[in-house]
């Protein structure tokens, strides 16, 4: 669980997302409230429920990017799902309880990684012993083992090929598709789970170099030192107390006002989400999970539907509303210059692999931003994603001929942008289809 302050969370998000301060602040406060709740006494902690968030804003302004960056900051079980993937319980397709099952699976792998770090020193020692045994043999003297241990630590044996018995991770049972259940096991028991324990301990003999064997052996030895029951218990606790679910495309499950009957992949999904967001118990193969304290952040463009088209009960369960504004030309300039993952840096690095040096001038960046903003206004506003189309068009010729132009230096200024894009941008009819 992260202990960053709201100010630190916002400044971390600022590195990748331009503007949208309201959304960043709401998310930062929600994340900090998780930490605050942990500091409370047990009886009061159970009474403090998370305030779920609804982010509303046009496409391409940073809603999904906020969730992606938040996942890295949260250090808590985190899952991002699209609401459009689900159908009402009882119909073919995934039901919303699968969200919690996936969240638990994420938490278990995250908890196992953290716990592996705690036992890494002991696991490293055990892995070293297995490598020495594989090189020197089972009945080697202690002096011989010691000699090999010194060589091993010095790195002299890294390229030596050894044969080892390692755990066979392949399942002896083929995956079976259950009709009407895409993905087969849908979070419930599959044959591998049922018989895996009984047939456990299967090993396979593999040849590998000493340096390759370390990662596999350390993982195996760490797993031997970890108790599955403890890992599962810690993961379930983390999900129930600190879990965060990001529900994208929530506007796509709004029923159109003129629709007759309950649409199974729209209103039906909303009805199923109600108890999940309010707090219910979901059965998983690792045990029941209470969703009372899981934080839900929903987001949608609400391009066609309105937030008021959501079921009133669902609106009530998303009390914090945040509006994200559309991006302007100035924002595009900042996106191309200030972010840590700016497209300008990406294209410079990509062309650098072909030994072509690319540099951007201020007027070149201004021209890119101006064209992106103009096309957004005249055709369809798709936000920052328009920069991808514009940049790809500008670099189309250079990307194709880069291998033949090694050693050249390309300056992307207003003239370069105009030469590669000018005619397209001026003709609205053409830009409608091409950009």
From Swiss-Prot:
Keywords from the named record: ATP-binding, Chaperone, Cytoplasm, Nucleotide-binding, Stress response
Binding residues annotated for ATP, in chain numbering: 18, 60-65, 248, 313, 385
Residue ranges crossing the lipid bilayer per the database entry: none
Family annotation (InterPro entries): AAA+_ATPase (IPR003593), ATP-dep_Clp_protease_ClpX (IPR050052), ATPase_AAA_core (IPR003959), Clp_ATPase_C (IPR019489), HslU (IPR004491), P-loop_NTPase (IPR027417)
SMART domains named in the record: AAA, ClpB_D2-small
GO MF, one example: ATP binding
Biological process annotations from GO: protein unfolding; proteolysis involved in protein catabolic process
Intracellular or extracellular location(s): Cytoplasm
Keyword Transport among UniProt keywords: no
GO cellular component labels: HslUV protease complex
Function as written in the Swiss-Prot or TrEMBL entry: ATPase subunit of a proteasome-like degradation complex; this subunit has chaperone activity. The binding of ATP and its subsequent hydrolysis by HslU are essential for unfolding of protein substrates subsequently hydrolyzed by HslV. HslU recognizes the N-terminal part of its protein substrates and unfolds these before they are guided to HslV for hydrolysis.
Protein name: ATP-dependent protease ATPase subunit HslU
Taxon lineage: Bacteria, Pseudomonadati, Pseudomonadota, Alphaproteobacteria, Rhodobacterales
């Amino acid at each position: 669980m992260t202990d960053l302050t709201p100010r630190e969370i916002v400044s971390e998000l600022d590195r990748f997302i331009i503007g949208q301060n309201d959304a960043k602040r709401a998310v930062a406060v929600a994340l900090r409230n998780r930490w605050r709740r942990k500091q409370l006494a047990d009886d009061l902690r159970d009474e403090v429920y998370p305030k779920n968030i609804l982010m509303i804003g046009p496409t391409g302004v940073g809603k999904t990017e906020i969730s992606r960056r938040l996942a890295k900051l949260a250090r808590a079980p985190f899952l991002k799902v699209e609401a459009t993937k689900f159908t009402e319980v009882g119909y073919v397709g995934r039901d919303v309880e699968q969200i919690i099952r996936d969240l638990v699976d994420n938490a278990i792998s995250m908890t196992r990684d953290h716990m592996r770090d705690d036992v890494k020193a002991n696991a490293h020692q055990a892995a070293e012993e297995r490598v020495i045994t594989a090189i020197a043999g089972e009945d080697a003297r202690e002096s011989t083992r010691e000699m090999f241990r010194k060589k091993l630590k010095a790195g002299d044996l890294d390229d030596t090929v050894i044969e080892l018995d390692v755990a066979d991770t392949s399942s002896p049972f083929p995956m079976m598709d259950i009709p009407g259940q895409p993905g087969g096991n849908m979070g419930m028991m599959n044959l591998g789970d049922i018989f895996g324990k009984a047939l456990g301990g299967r090993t396979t003999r593999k040849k590998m170099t000493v340096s390759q064997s370390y990662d596999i052996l350390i993982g195996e030895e760490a797993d031997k030192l970890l108790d599955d029951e403890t890992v599962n218990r810690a993961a379930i606790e983390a999900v129930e107390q600190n879990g965060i679910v990001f529900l994208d495309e929530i506007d796509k499950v709004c029923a159109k006002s003129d629709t007759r009957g309950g649409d199974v992949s729209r209103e039906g999904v909303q009805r199923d989400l109600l108890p999940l967001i309010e707090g219910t118990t979901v059965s998983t193969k690792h045990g029941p999970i209470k969703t009372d304290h899981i934080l839900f952040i929903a987001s949608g463009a609400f391009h066609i539907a309105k937030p008021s088209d959501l079921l009133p009960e669902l609106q009530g369960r998303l009390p914090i509303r945040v509006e994200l504004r559309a991006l302007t030309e100035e924002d595009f300039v900042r996106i191309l210059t200030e972010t840590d993952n700016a497209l300008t840096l990406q294209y410079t690095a990509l062309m650098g692999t072909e030994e072509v040096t690319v540099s951007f001038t201020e007027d070149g960046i201004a021209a890119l931003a101006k064209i992106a903003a103009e096309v957004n206004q005249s055709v369809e506003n798709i936000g920052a994603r328009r920069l991808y189309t514009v940049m790809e068009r500008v670099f189309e010729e250079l990307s194709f001929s880069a291998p033949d132009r090694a050693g050249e230096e390309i300056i992307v200024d207003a003239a370069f942008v105009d030469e590669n894009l000018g005619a397209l941008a001026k003709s609205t009819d053409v830009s409608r289809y091409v950009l």
